[in-house]
Amino acid sequence: MIEIPTGLPAELVPLSWLLGVWEGSGVVEYAVGDETVRREFGQRISFSHDGLPHLNYSSYAWIEGDDGPVPFVTETGYWRLRRRVTDGDPGPAMLPPTDERPFTTAEEVETLCNADGGFDVEVALVHPGGVSELYVGQVKSARIDLATDAVLRTEGAKSYTGATRLYGFVERDLLWAWDIAALGQPLRTHASGRVSHVD
């Protein structure tokens, strides 16, 4: 059963099952040429909100070493329902809204439902290695399907051109899979994990 926290902005209800801190493990397996990289890792994922109509997201992964955990990778970003920004939303930058905040009731949020019975979502992620991703997709019940709409790379970043991600709430755990197109390779399986709610 998924509990909806008191004070959660109505726009976040379709994503509310993600809220909290999750911890578990996963595996990365990716072939480049004749070499295949395979690593198991531990992972901690956090989804939170600060009263605004988006989720704050962070993921930190580590590899178990002989002397304890060794930092591996991290990413951070924001998840929200995909809709046109209105005068009731802040921005750009630090500009305040000039109208009432939109989509504050369940009835108003239901108008954002798509033809498939889900809600369109967008996810903006930043990686410290010089890659930023914008994903678009859909949340339907306790499943999220995402595909990159845009990838930005700094001059020094490794080659990375696109990705898809899948998230699902299964047996009270968060399962995910991440396919990537990188290092001159087409889109293919890259990593997956299973994390449990710890907070």
From Swiss-Prot:
<comment type="pathway">
    <text>Nitrogen metabolism.</text>
</comment>
<dbReference type="GO" id="GO:0020037">
    <property type="term" value="F:heme binding"/>
</dbReference>
<keyword id="KW-0349">Heme</keyword>
<keyword id="KW-0413">Isomerase</keyword>
<dbReference type="GO" id="GO:0062213">
    <property type="term" value="F:peroxynitrite isomerase activity"/>
</dbReference>
<protein>
    <recommendedName>
        <fullName>Peroxynitrite isomerase</fullName>
        <ecNumber>5.99.-.-</ecNumber>
    </recommendedName>
</protein>
<keyword id="KW-0479">Metal-binding</keyword>
<dbReference type="GO" id="GO:0046872">
    <property type="term" value="F:metal ion binding"/>
</dbReference>
<keyword id="KW-0408">Iron</keyword>
<feature type="binding site">
    <location>
        <position position="158"/>
    </location>
    <ligand>
        <name>heme b</name>
    </ligand>
</feature>
<dbReference type="InterPro" id="IPR014878">
    <property type="entry name" value="THAP4-like_heme-bd"/>
</dbReference>
<feature type="short sequence motif" description="GXWXGXG">
    <location>
        <begin position="20"/>
        <end position="26"/>
    </location>
</feature>
<comment type="function">
    <text>Heme-binding protein able to scavenge peroxynitrite and to protect free L-tyrosine against peroxynitrite-mediated nitration, by acting as a peroxynitrite isomerase that converts peroxynitrite to nitrate. Therefore, this protein likely plays a role in peroxynitrite sensing and in the detoxification of reactive nitrogen and oxygen species (RNS and ROS, respectively). Is able to bind nitric oxide (NO) in vitro, but may act as a sensor of peroxynitrite levels in vivo.</text>
</comment>
<dbReference type="InterPro" id="IPR012674">
    <property type="entry name" value="Calycin"/>
</dbReference>
<dbReference type="InterPro" id="IPR022939">
    <property type="entry name" value="Nb(III)_bact/plant"/>
</dbReference>
<dbReference type="InterPro" id="IPR045165">
    <property type="entry name" value="Nitrobindin"/>
</dbReference>
<comment type="subunit">
    <text>Homodimer.</text>
</comment>
<comment type="similarity">
    <text>Belongs to the nitrobindin family.</text>
</comment>
<dbReference type="Pfam" id="PF08768">
    <property type="entry name" value="THAP4_heme-bd"/>
</dbReference>
<feature type="binding site" description="axial binding residue">
    <location>
        <position position="190"/>
    </location>
    <ligand>
        <name>heme b</name>
    </ligand>
</feature>
